[in-house]
A protein has these predicted regions:
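Short, contiguous strand/loop micro-motifs
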Residues: 27-29, 83-84, 133
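Catalytic activation segment of kinase domains across protein kinase-like and atypical kinase folds
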Residues: 61-70, 76, 106-148
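C-lobe/activation-segment region of protein kinase-like
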Residues: 123-187
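Conserved ATP-binding subdomain of kinase catalytic cores across diverse folds
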Residues: 1-70, 102
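Repeat-unit-sized solenoid/scaffold elements
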Residues: 57-92, 180-188
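Conserved kinase catalytic-core helix
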Residues: 35-52, 75-113
Length: 188
């Protein structure tokens, strides 16, 4: 729903301000705009080779945006994947995220529930909209979110080690600005 999205987007932008940068999350005026963006973002992820369920349709019903994605049989969200599997495959998540960033994309809402494991493959879902001209900040924010997702499961050292397989130390250090804000989010 667009109103809920607007409130959450405002909160994220306030968090970005508190981290010393301008807000970089876009908001949508209607539920349809919101799901059309997610449809397009999912298509773009797939075009660059990042696993994401194939988008089928986006529409509005009773004031709610509905995005229909391909069915992934027997998937687990990252919350339900064992710590051992996460530790073994954490570098893959950073490789996927790095691929987004290398192609001028960002996830913007990387949480455990937006990372799926299906048939041995990781998938990203629920990408949000960020300003195209803020690549450094959105990369740092995505990295902070990924580290916040992984750290409680595999520990800080293993999470950072996995991140170094895909990112330069200077890029990783830029994520520090967002760690306090990301820790405050109720979903991390």
């Amino acid at each position: 729903n667009a109103l809920v999205h607007a409130v959450l987007t405002t909160g994220r932008n306030v968090g970005a301000f508190s981290s010393g940068t301008e807000g970089f999350f876009d908001r949508f005026d209607t539920p349809r705009e919101m799901v059309e963006h997610e449809y397009e973002a999912t298509e773009r992820m797939r075009e660059i080779g990042v696993n994401a369920p194939r988008p089928i349709d986006a529409f509005e019903v009773n004031g709610l945006g509905v995005l229909v994605l391909e069915y992934l049989p027997e998937f687990e969200s990252l919350d339900d994947v064992s710590d051992a599997v996460i530790a073994d495959r954490a570098a893959e998540l950073f490789e996927m995220l790095s691929s987004l960033h290398e192609h001028g994309l960002a996830h913007g809402d990387l949480r455990a529930e937006n990372i799926l494991l299906s048939d041995g493959e990781f998938y990203f879902i629920d990408a949000t909209s960020v300003h195209d001209d803020r690549a450094d900040e959105t990369t740092a924010y995505d990295l902070a979110c990924a580290l916040a997702v992984l750290e409680p499961r595999i520990g800080p050292r293993k999470a950072v080690d996995a991140a170094t397989t895909a990112y330069a130390p200077s890029t990783l250090l830029s994520a520090r600005a967002f760690l306090d804000f990301v820790r405050l989010r109720p979903d991390h």
